[in-house]
């Protein structure tokens, strides 16, 4: 594990300790991302309100440490497999939206945070006949999916 990964893991542990949550934190290096897996009793606290606390924690980690990574990967913070499930749900929704775009023209998805937008763009890129574009000036942007 690299120094930046250790620092990111330590930050997550410190934030959880400050919230008085005794949870386990494991940093896993994968080809796509550096995953910070949180587990243990009480993890549901991070998943309330559609995982907003988990999203915020992921944004903080990426803002603080992503630029120190030697490649273009980012950090993915997951708790009790919640993010993994939501990611697959978003991929399925993107594929469905791509099919609609093929039949009836450009389709919008959003507003989406940067992590979700990246996932949508990567899913669309799997089909060479389709393209995607983010529009908007705010943190949450809309993704337009259309045929090339």
Where are these regions (language model features)?
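RNA-contacting regions in translation and RNA-metabolism proteins
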Residues: 1-148
């Amino acid at each position: 594990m690299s120094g930046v990964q250790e620092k990111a893991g330590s930050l997550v542990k410190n934030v959880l300790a400050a919230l008085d949550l005794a949870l386990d934190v494991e940093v896993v290096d994968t080809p796509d991302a550096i995953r910070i897996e949180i587990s243990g009793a009480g993890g549901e606290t991070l998943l309330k309100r559609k995982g907003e606390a988990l999203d915020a924690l992921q944004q903080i980690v990426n803002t603080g440490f992503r630029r120190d990574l030697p490649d273009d990967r980012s950090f993915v913070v997951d708790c009790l497999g919640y993010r993994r499930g939501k990611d697959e749900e978003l991929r399925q929704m993107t594929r469905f939206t791509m099919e609609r775009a093929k039949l009836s023209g450009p389709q919008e998805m959003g507003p989406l945070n940067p992590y979700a937008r990246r996932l949508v763009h990567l899913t669309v890129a799997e089909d060479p006949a389709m393209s995607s574009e983010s529009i908007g000036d705010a943190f949450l942007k809309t993704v337009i999916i259309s045929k090339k």
